[in-house]
């Protein structure tokens, strides 16, 4: 705990319990804040899966997979009553429903600090979520509004000034634990080929993650296997595409991998490839950086921000989404050249030190500090700055 920050009672609020980067980031933040002496509970509005039931200090307000109209009314009443009873100093919320809906209820319940966190660009929200978030932020339900990257903050540029004045950036942070396995043992753990380069992608099998691009370029690569870790609605489509391209024998669909096993999976790989269409800030890329992998990524703004610009300044290859040839050339160079992979891995590992859980926690801790003036917000680039 910062020497000037009093011990706080905090509620971390998120829309639903399910596998996802936002959920992992919120739980990571909770553990870090708790280690600094704060009283922290994590509340899920509802439960799509029971994934985190065994975590400490968890509440589920409505144990259903998807609340209907009556369910949302129940959520409003339960959240209001539990906030009034718990009397937190601050609520930190992740994801649009927890932001707009949850922080409006928190304001009604008299919570003094209400920090919303935007995890993706505004244009990715559904229309009614956009309206809810815009209204809540404009009417003062957020005392601070955090984007996990500057590109996310920039996506709100057309919002009203009363909304924008609360925006700031706190990047994601990873509490990294290196694998204790050597690469051969790591490959054996997951049943992966013992020889040849492994190209790894971690993420939901969904349109956003764009794994089809990797399948399209795989036939042109002289060696290597593609490992897809994750599951989702696009799995069947991707399996059919692999068959159509004649690369089924070179693609491994691992399915969901437990979070605790991710360091071992990254140790097994040589190259991390992520042709994602959009991100807020990718935890998967941060983990690959901490693990020291050569990284090839789409050149979307969030990835450019994380990987350090473009050209010689970048710690990974940043490539356009509409140029399969560029992806083929980049991956082929890495497949053929272990020394190039090692150089890129070293640079990625060095830049990863900018994205630690301590830095992320510092940012949120300043925003919920009830001893600080409410008109000041935290930016990791500029320290504390007065809102305009």
Protein language model features and the residues they cover:
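Short hydrophobic beta-strand element within catalytic cores of glycosyltransferases
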Residues: 44, 294-297, 304-307
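A short helix/loop element that forms part of the nucleotide-sugar donor recognition site in Leloir-type
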Residues: 179-192, 377-382
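Conserved acidic donor-binding segment of nucleotide-sugar-dependent glycosyltransferases
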Residues: 308-325, 333-338
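Aromatic "clamp/platform" in nucleotide-sugar-dependent glycosyltransferases that forms part
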Residues: 277
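Short alpha-helical donor nucleotide-sugar binding micro-motif in glycosyltransferases
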Residues: 83, 256-257, 264-269
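A conserved mid-protein helix/loop that constitutes part of the nucleotide-sugar donor-binding site
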Residues: 20-31, 197-220, 224, 233-239
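N-terminal strand-loop element at the rim of the active site
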Residues: 7, 12-74, 233
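Short His-centered aromatic/hydrophobic patch
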Residues: 93-99, 118
């Amino acid at each position: 705990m910062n020497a000037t920050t009093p011990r706080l009672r905090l509620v971390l609020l998120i829309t639903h319990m399910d596998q996802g980067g936002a959920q992992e980031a919120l739980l990571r933040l909770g553990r870090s804040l708790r280690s600094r002496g704060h009283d922290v509970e994590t509340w899920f509005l509802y439960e799509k899966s029971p994934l985190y039931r065994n975590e400490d200090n968890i509440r589920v307000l409505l144990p259903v997979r998807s609340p209907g109209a009556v369910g949302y009314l129940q959520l409003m009443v339960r959240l209001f009553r539990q906030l009034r009873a718990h009397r937190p100093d601050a609520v930190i919320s992740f994801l649009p429903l927890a932001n707009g809906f949850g922080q409006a209820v928190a304001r009604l319940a008299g919570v003094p600090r209400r920090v919303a966190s935007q995890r993706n660009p505004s244009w990715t929200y559904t229309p009614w979520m956009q309206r809810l978030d815009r209204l809540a932020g404009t009417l003062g339900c957020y005392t601070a509004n955090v984007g996990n990257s500057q590109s996310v903050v920039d996506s709100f540029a057309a919002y009203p000034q009363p909304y924008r004045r609360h925006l700031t950036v706190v990047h994601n942070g990873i509490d990294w634990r290196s694998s204790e396995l050597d690469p051969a043992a790591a490959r054996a753990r997951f049943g992966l080929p013992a020889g040849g380069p492994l190209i790894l992608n971690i993420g939901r099998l969904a349109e956003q993650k764009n794994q089809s691009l990797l399948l399209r370029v795989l036939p042109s690569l002289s060696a290597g296997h593609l490992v897809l870790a994750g599951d989702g609605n696009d799995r069947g489509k991707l399996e059919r595409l692999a068959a159509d391209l004649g690369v089924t024998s070179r693609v491994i669909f691992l399915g969901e991998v437990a979070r605790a096993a991710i360091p071992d999976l990254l140790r097994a790989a040589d190259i991390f490839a992520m042709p994602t269409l959009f991100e807020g800030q990718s935890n998967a890329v941060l983990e690959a950086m901490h693990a020291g992998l050569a990284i090839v990524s789409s050149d979307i703004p969030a990835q450019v921000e994380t990987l350090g610009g473009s050209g010689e300044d970048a710690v990974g290859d940043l490539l356009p989404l509409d140029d399969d040839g560029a992806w083929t050339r980049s991956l082929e160079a890495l497949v053929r050249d272990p020394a190039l992979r090692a150089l890129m891995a070293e640079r990625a590992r060095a830049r990863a030190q900018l994205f630690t859980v301590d830095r992320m926690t510092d940012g949120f801790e300043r925003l919920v500090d009830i001893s600080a003036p409410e008109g000041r917000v935290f930016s990791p680039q500029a320290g504390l700055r007065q809102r305009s």
